[in-house]
């Protein structure tokens, strides 16, 4: 617990937040810091206790008084803080590096007699894996090497080996602790005596092969011969060498750490996770001997080629999808009006000999293959020719997201026999469903133009049903920006109606919708951008002075009426005589008693 002083150069923000106070029955402390802020650069930490602010004792201050005191500091902020005691950290557990130490127990000098063996070329003293340093029984289980995987279980009698049984090999006492044996070789255990014959200890049994071809039999016999003779050709990596120190005069712990590490790394090369198509070591050895190691790879390649040949090209798939998505052409009765024609989803009217503007059907929902109608304004002639699909899609028109235009649902015959909402008769055959009612297709007509609305959009207005064109002509309001009819959500502002996408903020371009907005030079601004561009910031709390807020001007700044207070006692100075020191307002009591 140490005290220290901090002097932060103004202006605000200072980069920290307070918590506590007299009203919370807890001392004022630093609750949070802003990354890279002035407080963080001054080595202020979270949890430090604030003792004084600009020379005033902070122990009796409430939270609001301390906040106003800090806000009143404009040029610089001087504070005295008390460092919070650091919580004791648990000591880290040391990580053991390197190999664990071996515990070697004293053993008698005279080692037990080791029976003579004829050869040590193929001896496998490797034991079953166990944690380092563990003590096990002297019995050793021999693990066959990959080269001896196909040796017969019983030693066969050959012309080079004696018919007498081979004695079992007893490992030295040092093998019990997981280390290689280091023993003096006696006269009867000389290297020349150890290389007199061959042995086969604990080799796996292989069943007799009776139904294989002659070539496979020869390859298997060759593998058996290499395994029994200790051939130096290995299937997985370089051959392993036993590390034995000879001609030592005393027993000691062998220093084989580097070699053991290397051999341990070689043994664990195949311990990584395998995928579903990776074979184990035994299967790879068998595949190499039988010559089938590349068979599955070729089969996998053929399968990939077959799959690739079956996948259609992107252009073909897109063309098929577009063909499937095209609706069936339906003939609809038309009246004598020269502006309405039955079109497909991608059709649009193309003006001829005029500079009219094509109006896209804004009521149409995306991904809906339905007929649409177009209307050309300021044009004297109409043409029934159909323009390309991209001619209508390339134009950017304001879209009505919440459109009022609906479409009738076509129901085939045979499912049910509803009642027509127009004639109140039973419908036999296909019918339409709209607004929760059923209609004869020939009786679902516009209330004004009497055209069928079976394949076009309709809008319900004052209890009657109108087609899209009649509703747009007689009922739909006009947008104050694009001068087009609004078929969806209407924004009413500034005594005009707007599309949602047309009534946007001038600064950020986002739709204002029903939110608060401000006008500046006749242009609408959202609340955030307006205060950022044109708003007045209070010098005390650094918040904008909104419309309707009481404010005053003093010392060349603008203040909220509640923010213009004495920097020491936080007494309101509105309408009172005040003094100023370094742009900080002071009351009469503290004008000459406080030095900044």
Curated annotation (Swiss-Prot):
Gene Ontology biological process: actin cytoskeleton organization; cell growth involved in cardiac muscle cell development; heart development; muscle structure development; regulation of dendritic spine morphogenesis; regulation of synapse assembly
Region (Disordered): 121-165, 196-240, 255-340, 354-381
Residue numbers of Phosphoserine PTMs: 2, 111, 134, 137, 228, 260, 309, 313, 322, 360, 362
Tissue/organ expression: Heart and skeletal muscle specific. Expression is commonly increased in the brain of patients with bipolar disorder, schizophrenia, and major depression.
Keyword Amino-acid biosynthesis set for record: no
InterPro entries noted in UniProt: PDZ, PDZ-LIM_domain, PDZ_sf, Znf_LIM
Modified residue annotations for N6-acetyllysine: 89, 350
Residue span(s) of domain PDZ: 2-85
Segments of skewed composition (Basic and acidic residues): 258-273, 293-304
Keywords attached to this entry: Acetylation, Cell projection, Cytoplasm, Isopeptide bond, LIM domain, Metal-binding, Phosphoprotein, Repeat, Synapse, Ubl conjugation, Zinc
Domain LIM zinc-binding: 418-477, 477-536, 536-596
Pfam family, one: LIM
N6-succinyllysine PTM positions: 89
Highest taxon of source: Eukaryota
Compositional bias annotation for Low complexity: 144-165
GO molecular function: actin binding; actinin binding; cadherin binding involved in cell-cell adhesion; metal ion binding; muscle alpha-actinin binding; protein kinase C binding
Modified residues (N-acetylserine): 2
Entry keyword Ion transport: no
Subcellular location: Postsynaptic density; Presynapse; Postsynapse; Cytoplasm, Cytosol
Glycyl lysine isopeptide (Lys-Gly) (interchain with G-Cter in SUMO2), cross-linked positions: 89
Primary subcellular site in the record, as a coarse category: other
Subunit structure, as described in the record: Interacts with various PKC isoforms through the LIM domains. Interacts with actin and alpha-actinin through the PDZ domain. Interacts (via LIM domains) with SIPA1L1/SPAR; this interaction may occur preferentially with isoform 1.
Function, in words: May play an important role in the heart development by scaffolding PKC to the Z-disk region. May play a role in the regulation of cardiomyocyte expansion. Isoforms lacking the LIM domains may negatively modulate the scaffolding activity of isoform 1. Overexpression promotes the development of heart hypertrophy. Contributes to the regulation of dendritic spine morphogenesis in neurons. May be required to restrain postsynaptic growth of excitatory synapses. Isoform 1, but not isoform 2, expression favors spine thinning and elongation.
Protein known as: PDZ and LIM domain protein 5
Taxonomic lineage from the root: Eukaryota, Metazoa, Chordata, Craniata, Vertebrata
Gene encoding the protein: PDLIM5
